[in-house]
């Protein structure tokens, strides 16, 4: 399975997952349709599934047009069936979704929203975390509680360290500034910041990261106490 990163809107990431044998593909969190359509047509791909991590418009804005144009099925969390546009397949926490070569375990990770999920393609050792886990950050808490977000991150931090992380936004450098302010003597963090700056200078994105890198550099994953996590999240909201 090949993963292509598609930049959408101002700073969103969508992802196209490709079966190179038959050219079938999925798209994760299409914030808008046009960049997805352009890539699919240019590369002669067949869009079969639209995977949504949560209901926010910058992650589902392309659903309607993509479904209409390609007759793709929309996949999302059962608890968000009334909020995800055009949803066809409703999934629950712990369920395995399997179509074609695509196989993912669903993690319900409330915090940013009540109905947020991650798609863990465990055989490929990669996970799409939407706005729950960012590189060197985590999502703002809009609907859930601090405790829910803290527990959701605890679930993700227990994945294999070489699991690749693909998140929903290019927030990495801004996030790194906050991590550095809290953890200024972290050499692994300093090295990762240099690496990311070089990637962006070359016109690339900061994706993917890995669970191992985030355990070393992400101040929110390094937190092992709910009160400490709450303090950090409040500080970041005003950083």
Regions of interest found by a model, annotated:
Residues 17, 29, 54, 66, ...:
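Divalent metal-coordination and catalytic microenvironments
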Residues 137-162:
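Active-site-adjacent loop/tail segments of enzyme domains
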Residues 25, 32-105, 195-199:
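Active-site HxH/HxHxD metal-binding segment of metal-dependent hydrolases
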Residues 50-60, 109-115, 166-172:
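Histidine-centered catalytic micro-motifs
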Residues 30-32, 55, 79-80, 112-113, ...:
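Active-site metal-binding loops of divalent metal-dependent hydrolases
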Residues 16, 96-122, 126-127, 158:
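Core dinuclear metal-dependent hydrolase active-site scaffold
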Residues 154-164, 173-239:
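Accessory terminal helices/loops
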Residues 1-43, 119-130:
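Conserved beta-strand hairpin/beta-sheet module of binuclear metal-dependent hydrolase folds
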């Amino acid at each position: 399975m090949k993963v292509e990163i598609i930049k959408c809107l101002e700073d969103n990431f969508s992802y196209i997952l490709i079966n190179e044998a038959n050219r079938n593909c999925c798209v994760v969190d299409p914030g808008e349709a046009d960049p997805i359509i352009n890539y699919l047509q240019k590369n002669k791909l067949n869009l079969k599934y639209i995977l949504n991590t949560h209901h926010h418009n910058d992650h589902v804005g392309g659903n309607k047009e993509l479904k209409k144009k390609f007759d793709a099925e929309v996949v999302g969390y059962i608890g968000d069936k009334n909020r995800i546009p055009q949803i066809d397949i409703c999934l629950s926490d712990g369920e395995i979704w399997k179509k074609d070569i695509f196989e993912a375990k669903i993690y319900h990770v409330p915090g940013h929203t009540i109905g947020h999920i991650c798609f863990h393609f465990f055989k490929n050792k990669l996970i799409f975390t939407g706005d729950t886990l960012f590189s060197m950050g985590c999502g703002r808490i809009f609907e859930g509680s601090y405790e829910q977000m803290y527990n959701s991150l605890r679930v993700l931090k227990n994945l294999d360290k070489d699991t690749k992380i693909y998140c929903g936004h290019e927030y990495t450098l801004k996030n790194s500034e906050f991590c550095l302010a809290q953890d200024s003597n972290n050499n692994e963090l300093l090295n990762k910041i240099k690496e990311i700056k070089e990637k962006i200078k070359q016109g690339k994105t900061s994706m993917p990261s890995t669970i191992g890198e985030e355990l070393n550099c992400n101040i929110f994953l390094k937190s092992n106490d709910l009160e400490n996590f709450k303090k950090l999240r409040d500080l970041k909201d005003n950083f």
